[in-house]
């Protein structure tokens, strides 16, 4: 570093003799200090090359995925996935035999489209991609980690996007909700993700009474109400309360049995109300009269 300092001072002063005595600095050191290495799109391409290389080890592919995801947290880099034609290879990893790679691919998809309408639209250009993620979320044979990441990806794909939400519904997305919410062995995190996905769809589609009836018919409402209990995770309770508020706002009319169950379950939440979202709690309280 001292050598670099002497060289830079002499060079700035135009003292060729002093600069020569100091000696030329290490090019690698200059690159580290002042940049000039591979640009981020090139790093993205290199990472994907490792991921797609059949000779690369799984560990090396996981490192490449970590690097790729870190890069596409930047909005411009996320949008460059389409420009660099990297969506197709990324989506193909959803069918990898390696569970960890499927999980990483889902995580990258979810991060790339998060609050990014352009990347959402780019993802939707790929036929069958939505269906693949829905199936990963649906499969009981998949690990909890993969399924939870699938719900994460789906939530970010549909959020504030009417076309994506409609495609999700058309591909049978609503049918995966009730089984996840009812299954006793399903982790709380996945249930929270599932309800977050459902509320994103409801909001994006500006759901009407007919859509809310669909939620009832598919047993999603029934499965959700099972989690209105003081022993449940507060975040899970919040999601259910928010679902009720959204359904009411869409014009849904709850029947006598439903109102009775909601009222009884809601009353049991009083001891934990300070842990819950105040707005949704009060909105449901007002709804019940």
Curated annotation (Swiss-Prot):
Name listed for the protein in its UniProt record: Hsp70 nucleotide exchange factor FES1
Highest rank taxon of the organism: Eukaryota
Keywords: Cytoplasm, Repeat, Translation regulation
SUPFAM superfamilies, per the entry: ARM repeat (SSF48371)
Organism per entry: Eremothecium gossypii (strain ATCC 10895 / CBS 109.51 / FGSC 9923 / NRRL Y-1056)
CC terms in the record's Gene Ontology section: cytosol; endoplasmic reticulum
Cross-referenced Gene3D superfamilies: Leucine-rich Repeat Variant
One Pfam short name: Fes1
The organism's taxonomic lineage, starting at the top: Eukaryota, Fungi, Dikarya, Ascomycota, Saccharomycotina
InterPro entries cross-referenced by the UniProt entry: ARM-like, ARM-type_fold, Armadillo, Hsp70_NEF-Inhibitors, Nucleotide_exch_fac_Fes1
């Amino acid at each position: 570093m001292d050598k670099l300092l002497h060289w830079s001072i002499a060079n700035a002063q135009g003292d060729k003799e002093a600069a020569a005595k100091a000696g030329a600095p290490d090019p690698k050191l200059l690159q580290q200090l002042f940049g000039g290495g591979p640009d981020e799109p090139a790093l993205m391409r290199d990472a994907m090359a490792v991921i797609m290389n059949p000779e690369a080890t799984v560990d090396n592919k996981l490192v490449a995925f970590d690097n790729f995801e870190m890069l596409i947290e930047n909005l411009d880099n996320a949008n460059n996935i389409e420009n660099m034609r990297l969506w197709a290879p990324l989506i193909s990893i959803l069918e990898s035999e390696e569970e960890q790679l499927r999980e990483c691919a889902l995580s990258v998809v979810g991060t790339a489209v998060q609050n990014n309408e352009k990347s959402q639209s780019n993802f939707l250009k790929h036929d069958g991609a939505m269906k693949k993620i829905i199936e990963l979320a649906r499969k009981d044979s998949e690990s909890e980690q993969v399924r939870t990441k699938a719900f994460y990806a789906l939530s970010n794909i549909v959020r504030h996007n009417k076309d994506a939400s409609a495609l999700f519904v058309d591909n049978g997305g609503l049918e995966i909700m009730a089984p996840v919410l009812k299954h006793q062995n399903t982790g709380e995190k996945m249930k929270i993700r599932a309800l977050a996905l459902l509320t994103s769809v409801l909001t994006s589609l500006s759901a009407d009474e007919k859509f809310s009836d669909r939620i009832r018919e598919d047993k999603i409402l029934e499965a959700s109400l099972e989690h209105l209990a003081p022993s449940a995770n507060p975040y899970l309770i919040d999601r259910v309360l928010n679902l009720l508020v959204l359904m009411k706002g869409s014009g849904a009319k709850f029947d006598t049995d439903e109102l009775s169950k909601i009222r009884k379950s809601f009353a049991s939440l009083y001891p934990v109300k300070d842990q819950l979202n105040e707005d949704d709690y009060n909105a449901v309280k007002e709804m019940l009269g």
